[in-house]
């Protein structure tokens, strides 16, 4: 089998395919960074043109390796792309100044990645490779998704707690088929740090290189259509903001969010919250996950929170939350503190928000109570006794 591959040769996704081709003894030739639009209208790379037209590193890799890939391999591809890679990029990109830096968000991704690596480390205690006794597409996919982390943020100190993952990673990247594509891989000697000047410079380069959208040419309207009153055209009805009719109040949520993101939580953000919170027009709620017995691995439990946040995106304008996973793998709980406008359950205001909330019990807290203030402060800082529960990791909705 021979074929053309479209994609940046230095991109880890393209490199996955090049390595898979070598493992399968297939000939794949790089044909440029961009895929031809007539054959790949979605514009996704890497893209493969050969005995089939395919896009995406995993699908192309599976196609090239053929029958050597089994269900066990596929599960690792899904783990790498669905769970591991988002945490890697969420931690690495801001650290190398390729994305804007928000301390708490980066800390979330760092904790999530560390949790996943601890699980993977236990899997690899007695294994040389992920599937079988030889290098496979599973190893290539997981290792390449971890490559940015090992290059930029997993320094010697971080690697001490994941000795099995590090040993396995070194084994994979030093295999001839992998080394031929990647060259010599150097591991991070220190954790990359965000640099505002570098971020500004990189952002300017990206903006400059972005293709400018062409303005559509205006076509002359037929006389009959031009004479038709504009009011006859159907107008798209805007959905009403569920919070629209509520009193505005004095608490400016965006100001608190900025303080929480950019200033010290204990000395700045928390005092700002309590000095400005408007208990007459806003409320504080605590939630507890109803089914802790169903929670297994920590990173999978965190994805429950991530999914909930994604589905509640439109609620962000009028809400803030700190959700925390407590405990360890197969022995954990989830609870959180939420703040939103109004004194009723916000989820009941819109059908779009009634997806996850029924999996939690909700308790309205007394904003004037010292006990409430203590608990809210703990959830904002991710520090405290938490009623005896052991903090694992937290996620912020803002």
UniProtKB/Swiss-Prot annotation:
- Reading the lineage from the top rank, the first entry is Eukaryota
> What is the native source organism of this protein?
Caenorhabditis elegans
Q: Where is this region: Disordered?
A: 210-248
Q: Spans of biased composition, class Basic and acidic residues? A: 211-221
GO cellular component assignments: cytoplasm; nucleus
Its function?
Answer: Probably plays a role in anchoring the complex to other cellular components.
Q: What happens when the gene is disrupted?
A: RNAi-mediated knockdown results in 100% sterility at 25 degrees Celsius.
Q: Does the keyword Aminoacyl-tRNA synthetase apply?
A: no
Q: Does the keyword Protein biosynthesis apply?
A: yes
The protein's assembly and partners:
EF-1 is composed of four subunits: alpha, beta, delta, and gamma.
PANTHER family given for it?
ELONGATION FACTOR 1-GAMMA (PTHR43986:SF1)
**Can you summarize the PTM annotation of this record?**
AMPylated by fic-1.
Q: Where is the EF-1-gamma C-terminal domain?
A: 239-398
Q: Mind telling me which Pfam families this protein's record contains?
A: EF1G, GST_C
Arranged from A to Z, the UniProt key words for this protein are: Elongation factor, Protein biosynthesis
> What SMART domains does the entry give?
EF1G (SM01183)
A single MF term (Gene Ontology): translation elongation factor activity
**One GO BP annotation of this record:** translational elongation
Question: The GST C-terminal domain covers which part of the protein?
Answer: 66-199
Q: Which InterPro entries match?
A: EF-GSTs, EF1B_G_C, EF1B_G_C_sf, Glutathione-S-Trfase_C-like, Glutathione-S-Trfase_C_sf, GST_C
Q: This chain belongs to which protein, by name? A: Probable elongation factor 1-gamma
């Amino acid at each position: 089998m021979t074929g053309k591959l479209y994609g940046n040769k230095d991109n880890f996704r393209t490199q996955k395919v090049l390595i898979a081709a070598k493992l399968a003894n297939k000939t794949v030739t790089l044909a440029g960074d961009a895929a031809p639009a007539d054959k790949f209208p979605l514009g996704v790379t890497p893209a493969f043109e050969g005995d089939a037209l395919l896009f995406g590193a995993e699908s192309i890799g599976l196609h090239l390796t053929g029958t050597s890939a089994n269900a066990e391999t596929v599960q690792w591809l899904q783990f790498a792309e669905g769970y591991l890679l988002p945490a890697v990029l969420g931690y690495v990109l801001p650290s190398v100044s390729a994305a804007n830096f928000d301390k708490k968000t980066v800390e979330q991704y760092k904790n999530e990645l560390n949790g996943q690596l601890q699980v993977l480390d236990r899997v690899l205690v007695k294994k040389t490779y992920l599937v079988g006794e030889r290098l496979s597409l599973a190893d290539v996919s997981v290792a390449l998704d971890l490559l940015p982390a090992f290059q930029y943020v997993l320094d010697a100190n971080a690697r001490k707690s994941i000795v099995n993952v590090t040993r396995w990673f070194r084994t994979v990247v030093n295999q001839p088929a992998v080394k031929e594509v990647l060259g010599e891989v150097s591991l991070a000697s220190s954790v990359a740090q965000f640099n505002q000047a570098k971020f500004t410079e990189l952002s300017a380069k990206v903006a400059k290189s972005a293709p400018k959208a062409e303005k559509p040419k205006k076509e002359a309207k037929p006389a009959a259509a031009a004479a038709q009153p504009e009011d006859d055209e159907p107008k798209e009805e805007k959905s009403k903001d569920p919070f629209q009719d509520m009193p505005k109040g004095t608490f400016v949520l965006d100001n608190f969010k900025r303080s929480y993101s950019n200033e010290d939580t204990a000395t700045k953000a928390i005092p700002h919250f309590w000095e400005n919170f408007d208990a007459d027009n806003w409320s504080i709620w605590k939630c507890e996950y109803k089914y802790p017995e169903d929670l297994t691995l920590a990173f999978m439990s965190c994805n429950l929170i991530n999914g909930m946040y994604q589905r509640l995106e439109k609620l962000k304008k009028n809400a803030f939350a700190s959700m925390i996973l407590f405990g360890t793998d197969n022995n954990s709980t989830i609870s959180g503190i939420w703040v939103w406008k109004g004194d009723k359950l916000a989820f009941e205001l819109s059908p779009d928000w009634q997806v996850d909330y029924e999996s939690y019990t909700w308790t309205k807290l007394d904003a004037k109570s010292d006990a409430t203030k203590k608990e809210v402060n703990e959830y904002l800082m991710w520090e405290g006794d938490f009623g005896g529960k052991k903090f694992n990791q937290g996620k912020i909705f803002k």
